[in-house]
Amino acid sequence: MPNSQIRIYTQKEQGEEWLRRYRGSLPVFGCVLGFTETGLIPGISAAGRTPEDRKYTACADAEFLYYGPEHKPQHPLPPLAAGASPVLISRAVFESLKIPVHLFNAGLPHPPAVPLIDLGGASAKCLSGGAAMEITTVHHLFKQGLLWGERLAANMQESYVIFGECVVGGTTTALAILTALGIDAAGKVNSSHPICNHGQKWALVQAGLEKAGDRGQGRQGEQGEINFQSKIQDPKSKIRNSVDPLQLVAAVGDPMQVVVAGMAIAASRSCGVMLAGGTQMLAVYALMSAIAQAYALSWQPEAVVVGTTRWVAEDPTGATVDLALSLEKGNLTQSGTTPPLLATDLSFADSRYPQLRAYEQGFVKEGMGAGAACIAAHLSQNWQQDKLLAAIESQLERLSTAFH
């Protein structure tokens, strides 16, 4: 089987066609770093043991991705309750395959100590307030996304671009955006916890959408264009097409979402696109669809796939496949579609490191393009399980010996 290391969960034919088309080609990787104060809520995320740690998770991941394990980082990888940062996976592949990496700061509280492209964004406030970002910032970030998506795709006609993310608390903002777009996502998202904290996420999302709804009514008289409140009673209802999806991001989103949406819309016009992640990238895909419709932008949905890990796709405490299929049923677009959802078959069950075996218990799961990196290794060099595991374990080994 040519794709024995890659599982296709939705849109099988389209997924197989995409894999056929890009077999043997080397992608470039664009990683968008963002921050939402939602990530500081106690218990919301396992990506950093304390809220203070979580402020620096993206900085630490970016440094490791860029410099590797021998570099003495300004921000070391944060201690996790269990597991190890997924950046070990991405770094193992990108270093071995020499895949070019471009880092983008969409809005971080502290800039990372790596060469990156600053998009002039800002961190988002907690989504529970219903006013996460200034609309001017959202518009600016979207334009930057379109610009950089076109640039990254410029010489990639026969290949594809991977867009990844690092946003602590990002599955909660993803739930908020999906819900605001009329997609029934409650109880279907993932998290970095072994058992997803659905109740905590949903309470924050409800609070944020209600506050955004109140604000919408205040601004536009009685009718309130963004009538989120009826949405919450009926998550399946579709918001009227007059609602600006960028306004939804301003209300309850994070800076990464709108940047990657812009990048992927622009890149899809000239090359393949793999959105690297699970829940967060399904939200980005839904957002792309809604933005393209609202602003009459051309894009190529059939060029886009979502690539993640098996731990996300088969998370028994989420429902990723069901969520992917739900994109057709909600969405501000009449032509809401489900993208092919691909996942690497990578397993850590036989790893000699307990931090990696923790992934098999449901910790961490994904981030920094980890799943997509493994898919790329298989597509371009036909890497199998043993080669992937050895490369990832080598990163961990080098990290543990680097400063001892």
How would you label these PLM feature ranges?
Residues 2-164, 168-216, 238-404:
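N-terminal loops that bind phosphate or other acidic moieties
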Residues 214-240:
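Short, C-terminally biased terminal segments at protein or domain edges
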